[in-house]
Every structure is written in C-alpha cells, then in structure tokens.
Amino acid sequence: MKLELSRVVQGCRLGVLTGLGKSGQHSLEVPGCLLHTRCATVPHLTQDTLLTLSDLPAVTQVSVDSLAEHHEVLEEFKEGVRKFAGLHDTVIFCSLHDSASPSPAGHVTNKTVSVWGSGGRIELTAARFMSIQAAVQPDCYQSMADGETWQANTSRKRVRKAVDRTLAHLDECLVLHQKTQELKHAEIFGVVEGGDILEERLRSARETAKRPVGGFVLDGFHSSAMDQDVRAQLIQETSAELPQEKPRLVLGVGRPDEVISCVEAGVDLFESFFPFQVTERGCALSFNYTIDPDPETAGTSASTVLECNGETPEVKKPSANEDVENMTPFEINLKDKRYRDDFRPLVEGCVCYCCQKHMRAYVHHLLVTNELLAGVLLMLHNMAHYLGFFKALRDAITSDRLQDFKNTVLHRRQGD
C-alpha cells in the first residue's frame, strides 16, 4: 500500500492510494471515504442494489463491535468476512467501533478495550482482538486503542495514560500480527490519540510513526468532541509529525463542512456513516456542491439545506423531537408535512435512482406509513449525494477552486 500524492494545495492532499488488497490491484482516490457497513452490509441496501451506485469506494469498512459476538462463525468458515458476506471485489478495512453509534465510555483498562454488540459489552484483550482480526481477514485494520479521552473535562493525566495504553496496545498487536498467518498480507493502522492536548497528540503521532504501520487513524475528533477550529488546528499540527507517504484516516467526522475543514488540515480518508445517520432521521441530503451548475436546472429548484432561505447554516437548536434535534444544515426532513404535495425529486438534477424515479411526496408517504422502501430510497440518494460531494471536492482541489467549492457548500443557497 502506497499513497501517491499528485498535489498538495493549502494543506489539502490530492492523490491515489495504490497497492490495496491482497492482489495490490485496487486503488482509492484521496480525499475520499470508505464504504460504511454494519455487519458487512450497507444498511437498507442489498448487494445488487448497492452496485447500482456509481463511483463506489474501493474500500469497505467493517467494525469489530458488529462482528465480535459471533466471530466464531467466521473462524469456522475460514475464508474471511469478504466471502462470508458475499461482498463484491473490495478491500476490507476493519475498525474498532462503528462511528454511527457512539459507545459508552469508562470501560478501558491497561490490558483490555471494550466494544458493544447487540448483547452488551464485550471485553477484548489483545489476543482476543487479534483472533477476531484473523477470522475477519481484513486487508488493513485499526489497532486497539484507548479512545475515551475526547470529553472536554478529561484531565491531562488521563489523556497521557490513554496515549501510553494505545502505544502499548499497538506494540502487542504488532507482535501478534507477525505470528498470524491469516494477516500476513494485511496492513495495521496505528491510532493517534491525545484528546485536545496538543503535546500529547504530538507525542502520540511521533511514537506511532516509529512503528511499522501502514497508515494512521486520527481518533477522538468526532463532531461532539471539540470545536471545529480546535479540531483543525490539532489535526494540522499532528499531521506534520506523520510521514507524507502514508494515509491518514479520521474517525467520527462526516458532516460536509467538517470534512472540508479536515481535508484542509491534511486528512486523506473519512468514514461514510453520515448518509446512514441522515437516512435514519428520515432526511435527504440536499446541499449543493456544484460550483458551476447546469444552466438548464439552475434556479428551477435549488438544492436547499433545511429550507434555510440562504442563511449561513447553523446547527438547529435542541427540540423535543430527537430526529429534528440531530438534524444538520445539510439535509431536508421528508417527514415534514410540507412535502406531502411536493412532486419534485429530492434534489433537482440528481441522477440517483430515487431522484430519477420518485418524488418527495412519495418518499414522505413511505416515511409516514413506515414502509421499508423509504430507507432503501433514501440510502440510495444519500450515498450517491455523499460520494458526489467527495468527487466534487477532489475536482475543486485539482482545478484550484477549493474556495469556490467551500462557498458553494456552506453559503451559496436559496430557499425553496
């Protein structure tokens, strides 16, 4: 696995991650995202339905928390999760947690970490963690880590302990990795911890970079962890300590504005759990990412964000409705009664199956009647929109129009 950078513009790294998979024939453009799954399946979508989407990421993300409870089945199968789940020809990346469902804190020791499955907490030693990786047979995977120091009130002593534990876990995983035949072609990603303390972030990055890892996972930067400006500064200074030729994956960052900020700070890869979260709220991604819109569709039905009438996007204030409370300024709530008689596509000009075949009113009907098809159509649209956003981001960096792209995504909107 090798990261070949073609451009570095104002901190943004444009390139291709090559040599992926056992055959080394796969590649992934950066900045880019992994394909988020639960139990090795994209939520709401069958494999055939998923493959109707274009520009799917070459790397599929699975997580230990969704596989740990029944990994004995994978051990008996002996051919890994890719074949077990009937996945297409893809590269498997195995993370520790599913960022779409934050885990309870307070269950990490010097020797163990905990993940949460459907049956509750599962405590993992390094040996058990590596036995799960051997059963999954990923192409690359995240090392064990103590990632519970993202809270604002975490003491410096606790953060230092988390960095020490994470480095110790990495060393133990590296030893077991060398002894595991099923992982002889796999790459291990070291985890950079340190909370919001720059000194510990730098120490974690420097020490992790000394180990024989294939890439780096930047943990503890998810949306609720810290202010966006603080996150960007920490990532930028931490990234300066990491080798240029190895990829950097940030966990827990999915909102378009946060993705752009992290790309400017030097991040290469992201997860794609955000479209799933939007789908679960009964919402559709509707933000505009086209710098030069098609003149035939421009002005007919502008892509809107919370129907905000051109206002700069802000997170909605908490309300009694949990779905509305968690909404971001990049989506529309199709459960809202205003869409009952709205016969337009979810986003004008979108080429996804949902927008080509159906209208807002129909998806609204499916949602209020609790039809399973609602999740299928929304997931198809949201994934297509999110993947289109990343492609447009790469194109903007290529053409030196990142600022125009940011203005388009964050500010240049008109109300419906």
Swiss-Prot record:
Per the entry, what this protein does is: Non-catalytic subunit of the queuine tRNA-ribosyltransferase (TGT) that catalyzes the base-exchange of a guanine (G) residue with queuine (Q) at position 34 (anticodon wobble position) in tRNAs with GU(N) anticodons (tRNA-Asp, -Asn, -His and -Tyr), resulting in the hypermodified nucleoside queuosine (7-(((4,5-cis-dihydroxy-2-cyclopenten-1-yl)amino)methyl)-7-deazaguanosine).
Q: Which family does it belong to?
A: Belongs to the queuine tRNA-ribosyltransferase family. QTRT2 subfamily.
Q: Name one Pfam family in it.
A: TGT
Q: Which GO terms describe its molecular function?
A: metal ion binding; protein heterodimerization activity; protein homodimerization activity; tRNA binding; tRNA-guanosine(34) queuine transglycosylase activity
- GO CC term, one of those recorded: mitochondrial outer membrane
What broad class describes the main subcellular location of this protein? cytoplasm
Q: How does it sit in the membrane?
A: Peripheral membrane protein
List the cofactors. Answer: Zn(2+)
* Protein name (record): Queuine tRNA-ribosyltransferase accessory subunit 2
A GO BP entry:
tRNA-guanine transglycosylation
